[in-house]
Every structure is written in C-alpha cells, then in structure tokens.
C-alpha cells in the first residue's frame, strides 16, 4: 500500500504546490531533503527553505534532545517514552506548535506524541514546551505515516489529531493528501476501541473528501450527523479567527473506533 504524508509547516491555509512559483524564502530545498524524513515516493509535505530563528535553533539544540524521539522501525513503548501510564494522543503535523502547546497545557492528564518534519516548527514547539514546562509532549521529526506504521502498536492510542493538513487543492495533487483510505485504515488500527480520530480543515472540498473517506472506513463510526461541532479542547487559531470573521468555514470531523 502507498500512503501520502502529512502537512507542511503552515496550517490553516492551502500551500503552494511544488511546481508553482514561490518566494525565495519558501522555495523547495534543492535535491531531495525530504528523503531524510521519509522513504516513500508520494509525500504531502514539501520542505521549504524557511527561516530558522535564533530561539528556534537554540531549542532544537537544547530542548529537542530532551523531548525528541528518534524514528526507528521498532514498536515504541509509549508509557516508557513519557515516564508514566496515561492516555496517548498522536498529533500529525503541528505547524508552529501553538495549538499543540495549548491543548497539552489544558490536558495535563494526557500525553501527546507529536509528529512534524519542518525544522522551524519543531524548534518553535520545543520553545513552547520549555517555556510552558510541558512534560506531556514528545516530538518525532519524521514522516507521520512511517511513524504510525513502524512505531505505534495496534490499539495503543486514545486519539489522533489531524488539524488543517495541506488540502493539495489541485486535482492532480489529490494523491498527496494525507487523508486517504489506506492511511485512515492504518490510523484506525492504532486506535483503541472507543478512541477517536479528529480532523479539521478550512477547505470545504477537502472536508467533503475527508467525510467520504472516514465514513467508508468500517472500523470507524461518526460521532455526529456529518460534521461535528468544534470540540472545546481544540482552540481557535489566529488564522481561523480571521477567516471566521470573513465568513470562511471550518469543518471538524470526529470519528470513533468501533469496539
């Protein structure tokens, strides 16, 4: 099976496709730098030459060794990784980490295994972890599909978050979307019975795509009649607030693993 991969660093808006013109600061890194984070040929993340701040680099150097978990092809002992037994939630593609840090701070009784490839975003979340003294967040800087496939045991998770993934809005790029039948089946296999998968997007056509794909997965059931109200634990992003004021929509989908 082939899976597309997870979202690029900027969440909440469509990203430019790889073949579109981009500003110099956002141009794709020459060569194939994504190969460091994924062995798969179809990926939905594209590494950009983003600017790394001094603070982000410092926390990559100082904080990531404390909270980072290297990718490996071996099951991860999740309780050992966090030093306790607690519900484990995977967050796929956390952007710059603001939402992740807020959720983790609000839910200290849960542990969050977060996955992102973008260096400045990883550095930003590391900074927020250090500033907030968040003991319940760990980071894997790698392709989310490979992390779930190779490191997460079956029925081990209490939840999975996929917030504002790249919609890859051009039809020829739909194969790069992270929400695909095979990947949803993989996620479902990692959820414990009764655990949830929560997706959110501000791209209406992608919301419809997500709803169709999730509804077709036999191991999952919708918790709502179509789209779900935004759960209280998911804070509004700055981009989302601006969009709502302009009348733009945001769609949440919350599905539960059948027993």
UniProtKB/Swiss-Prot annotation:
Enzyme active site: 166
Residue ranges of the region described as Disordered: 1-36
Function description: Catalyzes the formation of N(7)-methylguanine at position 46 (m7G46) in tRNA.
Name under which the protein is recorded: tRNA (guanine-N(7)-)-methyltransferase
Enzyme category, top tier: transferase
A Pfam cross-reference name: Methyltransf_4
Organism: Aromatoleum aromaticum (strain DSM 19018 / LMG 30748 / EbN1)
Catalytic activity: guanosine(46) in tRNA + S-adenosyl-L-methionine = N(7)-methylguanosine(46) in tRNA + S-adenosyl-L-homocysteine
